[in-house]
């Protein structure tokens, strides 16, 4: 493994016990690739957002012992300097269109997030911040980024919802990555289920479902972003 001389190599060294490469194990390309992926994931969850598996190289020596390979892992030379820098979360900006795409835009600030929205936009007060696990100032984590995207997508109230970070060509020496979330509300489908529970001949309780009228879980008819 690389000598722990800087942030990224110290991080790699700290998890050698979790390595997928073991002395005496069979030498194969799949194991080498899996270890690259493990380290890249570790790095990207600890601020090194631009680190990639291909930035890790192996030097193999087969001359020391018969039928054995001595491996040395190194960080590839000439990779972008941004890949070796740990970032924190910067600003989180949200832009939401209403379901019609028409209306006046307004802006609110809520829990360290800036939200521009198109009126009328009816959502619960906590819907966005409670589903975004990234927070300004914390070490940037790709897992938290993916979790935020998944949480928002699973709400089922957006026609689309996209999460992007500062492009690599726009960093200009910055220590943080800004997050931009863009979305549009979907046209609400109004429905509810009426449950008719009845006893079956086999003594088990079975439901009879009747498709009916209106039910909102995340949308409120009279709560707008102005109420947040």
Give the predicted meaning of each segment.
Residues 1-199:
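Periplasmic polypeptide-binding modules associated with outer-membrane biogenesis and secretion
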Residues 177, 203-209:
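Hydrophobic, lipid-facing positions within transmembrane beta-strands of outer-membrane proteins
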Residues 184-186, 210-216:
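Structural signature of outer-membrane beta-barrel channels/translocons
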Residues 193-197, 207-211, 220:
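Transmembrane beta-barrel strands of outer-membrane/channel proteins
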Residues 217-224:
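Conserved small/polar residues in nucleotide/adenosyl-binding loops
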Residues 228:
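Cytosolic catalytic cores of cyclic-nucleotide second-messenger enzymes
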């Amino acid at each position: 493994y690389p000598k722990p001389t800087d942030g990224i190599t110290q991080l790699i060294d700290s998890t050698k016990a979790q390595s997928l490469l073991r002395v005496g194990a069979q030498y194969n390309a799949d194991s080498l690739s899996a270890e690259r992926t493990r380290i890249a994931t570790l790095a990207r969850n600890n601020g090194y957002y631009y680190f990639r598996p291909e930035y890790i190289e192996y030097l193999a020596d087969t001359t020391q012992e018969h039928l054995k390979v001595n491996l040395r892992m190194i960080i590839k030379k000439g990779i972008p300097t941004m890949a070796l820098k740990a970032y924190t979360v910067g600003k989180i900006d949200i832009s939401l269109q209403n379901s019609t795409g028409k209306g006046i835009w307004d802006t609110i600030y809520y829990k360290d997030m800036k939200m521009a929205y198109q009126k009328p936009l009816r959502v619960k007060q906590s819907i966005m911040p409670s589903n975004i696990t990234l927070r300004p100032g914390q070490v940037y984590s790709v897992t938290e980024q993916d979790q935020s995207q998944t949480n928002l997508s699973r709400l089922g109230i957006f026609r689309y919802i996209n999460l992007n970070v500062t492009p690599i060509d726009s960093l200009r020496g910055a220590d943080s990555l800004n997050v931009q979330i863009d979305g549009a509300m979907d046209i609400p489908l109004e429905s509810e289920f009426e449950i008719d529970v009845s006893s079956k001949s086999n003594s088990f309780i079975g439901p009879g479902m009747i498709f009916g009228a209106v039910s909102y879980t995340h949308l409120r008819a009279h709560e707008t972003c102005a109420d947040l």
